[in-house]
């Protein structure tokens, strides 16, 4: 792919050089670039969408679809019929983002803050989404990891506590192919949000409970989901967790449950990194 950026007088390109994507030698990043980017395939045909400072245009077999920011608090779109978004929630207590050169990004940021508030349940935990009214581990964890830990720390903590089983403490596994654990073992994603929450709050007493729960989770998974011959954990993919998005139709639940997902194994590795760091902070003995 080539990425071109339309400046006031010419098209400037990012080009492949030594295996990386970089600016042309004569390009000045401070003066030559605007907020209009166009992606072009190697064959030379533009992709079906383009961005401008205040909108995006998408051309497909459905026709031309556009979304345009009218202001930082209003977007007009005809992607799924004529629709208008206007900010309706009070977001004044959250970090403010502004830009002189991209109104669309500013409006989308404000929309994201509003949707965050709308996703808080009556029990002060995050719901998975409009069609998933309860709390789900993986959905909430990624949001907490990305930013919610410091934007809404109290709701983040309550969400993590809700997604923790008791007696003994362990991370709660969302449903997946074949039901849940151990076909799916990505509950260890809980560690991502737990560490992010600790980094923001420095709450060592909460870290103690998180360490206890993830320690038991690790011991349980090492006995049930770890393949010593391969050196990897079994289990379904995370993030794109609907099997129709990630596996061919001929994959059965048994096949998925005995496969080794790269992303899920990366999460297991992070959990062990969490346990190592937390043990050092809490002064745990090396035997643990």
Feature-to-residue mapping (PLM):
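Solvent-exposed, charged/polar functional surfaces in cytosolic regulatory/catalytic domains
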Residues: 111, 115, 220, 274
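Charged, glycine/proline-rich intrinsically disordered loops and linkers
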Residues: 76-88, 245
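The feature captures the catalytic groove of carbohydrate-active enzymes
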Residues: 61, 68-71, 172-188, 222-288
């Amino acid at each position: 792919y080539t990425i071109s950026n339309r400046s006031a007088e010419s098209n400037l390109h990012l080009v492949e050089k030594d295996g990386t994507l970089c600016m042309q030698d004569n390009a000045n990043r401070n003066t030559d670039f605007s907020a209009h980017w166009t992606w072009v395939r190697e064959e030379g045909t533009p992709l079906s969408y383009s961005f401008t400072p205040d909108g995006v245009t998408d051309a497909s077999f459905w026709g031309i679809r556009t979304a345009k920011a009218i202001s930082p608090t209003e977007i007009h779109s005809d992607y799924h019929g004529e629709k208008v978004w206007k900010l309706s929630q009070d977001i004044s207590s959250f970090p403010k983002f502004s830009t002189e050169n991209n109104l669309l990004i500013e409006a989308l940021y404000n929309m994201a803050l509003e949707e965050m508030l709308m996703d808080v349940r009556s029990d002060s935990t995050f719901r998975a989404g409009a069609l998933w009214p309860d709390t789900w581990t993986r959905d909430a964890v990624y949001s907490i990891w990305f930013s919610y830990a410091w934007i809404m720390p109290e709701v983040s903590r309550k969400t993590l506590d809700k997604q923790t089983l008791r007696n003994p403490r362990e991370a709660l596994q969302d449903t997946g192919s074949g039901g849940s654990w151990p076909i799916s073992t990505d509950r260890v994603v809980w560690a991502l949000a737990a560490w992010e929450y600790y980094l923001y709050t420095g709450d060592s007493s909460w870290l103690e409970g998180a360490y206890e729960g993830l320690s038991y989770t690790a011991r349980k998974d090492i006995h049930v989901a770890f393949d010593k011959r391969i050196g990897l954990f079994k289990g379904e993919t995370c993030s794109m967790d609907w099997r129709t998005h990630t596996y061919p139709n001929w994959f059965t639940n048994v096949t998925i449950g005995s496969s080794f997902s790269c992303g899920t194994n990366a999460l297991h590795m992070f959990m062990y990194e969490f346990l190592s760091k937390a043990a050092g902070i809490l002064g745990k003995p090396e035997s643990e």
